[in-house]
Amino acid sequence: MASFSILSIFKIGVGPSSSHTIGPMEAGARFCGLLKGILEQVMRIQITLHGSLALTGKGHLSDEAVLIGLHGIYANELELTTKKALLHEALENKVLKLANQHCIHFDYSKDLIFDNKPLARHQNALILKAFNAKNEVLKEETYYSVGGGFVYTEKELDNLSEEGENESVAYDFSSAKELLELCQKHQKNIAEIVRLREDALKNRPDAMMAKIYHAMLECYDNGANSKEKYLPGSLRVTRLAPSIKTRLEKHPTSGKDPLALIDYISLYARAIAEENASGGKVVTAPTNGACAVVPSVLLYAKNHLFENLSQKAINDFLLTSAAIGYLYKKNASLSGAEAGCQAEIGVASSMAAGGLACLCQASTQQVLIASEIAMEHHLGLTCDPVGGLVQIPCIERNVLGAIKAISASKLALEDEYKPKVSLDEVIATMYATGKDMNEKYKETSLGGLAKTLKC
């Protein structure tokens, strides 16, 4: 397998979920690639969503996502007008245009199966099969959407287990301890180490982070200025970001309230999280469900903490955040279906805390402390989306995740702070806690608020 890029912790895609929307879309597009040379023989496609993909798939738009993917389209390429046209053809006219070349009949009620039983390898699995005119299987593949928009086949997972994701990558690290040692050895900060690593892989870290930053800004602008009153779905959740923005423009917060800046953090986080919930274009950070934490903390820093924050400083924030996210992906999980919301909002808060500490000229040790503090106070957080939608409690958790990140960063900068828990230890604890967590609380909508709140 190709060496893993830390930059891929951030992906431009569409809402509402990285594992349940972006992942299935990629699986569908990749399956189209397997049909090259036999496409004209395909008469029918069967899609089976397993586990969490089945249980929350309709609310997370997993069903629509895989259909779009089967047209050969990836999430970063999708336009809203294209999405509407393709889904109308597939769902209303029952025509699926495989790889955007070969039209077949598609019956949603028969060809798309929701199987609540998870497969052994991961809670988010889907099986795609292509049949010929004799109803014989031409091609079959199982895909696992493991969180953050990352998708693997059975063989790819086996290779990961046997070989690891990276072989002899310069400046690579597998733990926070190794990262700290690298920084000390080369007298570099975390962002600089990530630059060196990605340069060795022939990537363009600064150009990529600038692109990611502008996509985050666009997402915020779209959410803050939306004319839609309600988010899609049965809950009819009101979009609050536009009204918060209007209020703050008319009545800016004064110095009388020392916590008034929280209103701006709420605006930034809600705008982005609401845009994600509406199916808009977003950036995984590290997931869609937690996509607002990192950018809202960055906007807080840019608009309220520092004057004239340079693009390099913004890139440093994002590269540092990505390095922290990489540690969680490598040693734990980014999937709410595998480890609960601690693996999404918790990781995002940990990433943002580290990024903010970096901007505040913290030492590498202090950056890692900030990231540890933020995760420590998300341990055990369940993933229980009401109605299978990425709205309640997801949107407000983004707000609180950002506030915790800022608090964690400030605490880590205290000269006398001496941590008892390391980042590596809290990452291991998060993963173990997630594995011990009852399946009802891991993105199934079978427990917690999802069960208590009737919709």
Model-derived regions: residue spans:
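An N-terminal structural lobe/cap that precedes and organizes the functional/catalytic core
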Residues: 1-12
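Conserved phosphate/anionic-ligand binding catalytic regions in large, soluble enzymes, centered on
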Residues: 10-28, 278-297, 341-349
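Short, mixed-charge aromatic SLiMs
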Residues: 44-57, 88-97, 317-330, 372-385, ...
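C-terminal regulatory domains involved in ligand/effector binding and gene-expression control
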Residues: 72-253
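Accessory "access/gating" subregions that flank catalytic or transport cores
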Residues: 202-336, 340, 448-455
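Hydrophobic alpha-helical bundle architecture
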Residues: 308, 320, 326-399, 411-420
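Extended hydrophobic packing segments that form well-structured cores
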Residues: 420-455
